[in-house]
């Protein structure tokens, strides 16, 4: 068995004295593991850093085997990603999100989105918006997609201001007004018009929105907690937009 694909390094684990087991997100074969011989060598360690884009060749006798990777560098961005807290936490948080999906399950659109986000993690506003959209895409692929295109009550496609916590569907400002205190806010940049830039308030609302549904549909049923890196990313992105912001008291303030 052999195949070749574009991939992004998610992480590595030591295996023996000189080798590692690499975890990558491939474009056409999803999240995949493989042994990299001499992966701890001076030549390979800089290549096998989270966030780097590589070309991998996977070989194994049978498809169900772990197999071996041969890895060639394409874009070595890991050093740059270590320069800001937003980038450091962002790489870790996206890896944790991808681990919610079955191994070897192809999600080419998530691979493409991951590459875009990795190139924008230096800009907190762009990174925050792209990260929220990435979380929405993961929710959708897990079968829990939100419907933000029209009002659940009236069918209206304008002035959408809320999201029902029960149905995950958008609600217009007028239809949702009587229950506004029980609704989740729909950030303008996620609306169907899509002509609003993300700012501190809208990103705060967006992180609450995706955090709520990830907790309800994924983390709670599986008996797991959200990755600490998600809270770190949220904190770093919002603090970059508002340097006067104090450290939030906990993940429930924004993340869920």
From Swiss-Prot:
One GO cellular component, as annotated: bacterial nucleoid
Keywords: DNA damage, DNA recombination, DNA repair
A matching Pfam family: RecO_N
GO biological process: DNA recombination; double-strand break repair
Family: Belongs to the RecO family.
PANTHER family reported in the protein's UniProt record: DNA REPAIR PROTEIN RECO
Main function: Involved in DNA repair and RecF pathway recombination.
Protein name in UniProt: DNA repair protein RecO
Native source species: Rhizobium leguminosarum bv. trifolii (strain WSM2304)
Origin organism lineage: Bacteria, Pseudomonadati, Pseudomonadota, Alphaproteobacteria, Hyphomicrobiales
Gene name, Swiss-Prot/TrEMBL: recO
């Amino acid at each position: 068995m052999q195949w070749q694909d574009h991939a992004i390094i998610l992480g590595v684990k030591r295996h023996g004295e000189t080798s590692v087991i690499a975890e990558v997100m491939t474009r056409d074969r999803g999240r995949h593991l493989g042994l990299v011989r001499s992966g701890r060598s001076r030549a390979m360690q800089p290549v096998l850093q989270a966030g780097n884009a590589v070309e991998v060749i996977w070989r194994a006798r049978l498809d169900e085997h772990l197999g071996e990777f041969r890895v060639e560098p394409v874009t070595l961005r890991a050093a740059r990603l270590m320069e800001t807290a937003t980038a450091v936490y962002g790489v870790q948080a996206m890896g944790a999100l991808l681990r919610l999906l079955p191994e070897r399950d192809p999600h080419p659109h998530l691979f493409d989105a991951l590459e875009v986000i990795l190139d924008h993690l230096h800009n907190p506003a762009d990174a925050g918006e792209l990260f929220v959209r990435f979380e929405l895409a993961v929710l959708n692929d897990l079968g829990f997609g939100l419907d933000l295109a029209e009002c659940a009550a009236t069918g209206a496609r304008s002035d959408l201001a809320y999201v029902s916590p029960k149905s995950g569907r958008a609600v217009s400002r007028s239809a949702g007004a009587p229950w506004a205190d029980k609704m989740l806010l729909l950030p303008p940049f996620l609306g169907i018009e899509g002509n609003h830039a993300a700012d501190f308030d809208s990103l705060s609302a967006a992180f609450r929105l995706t955090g709520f549904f990830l907790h309800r549909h994924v983390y709670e049923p599986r008996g797991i907690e959200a990755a600490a890196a998600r809270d770190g990313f949220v904190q770093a992105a919002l603090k970059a937009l508002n340097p006067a912001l104090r450290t939030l008291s906990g993940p429930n303030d924004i993340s869920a």
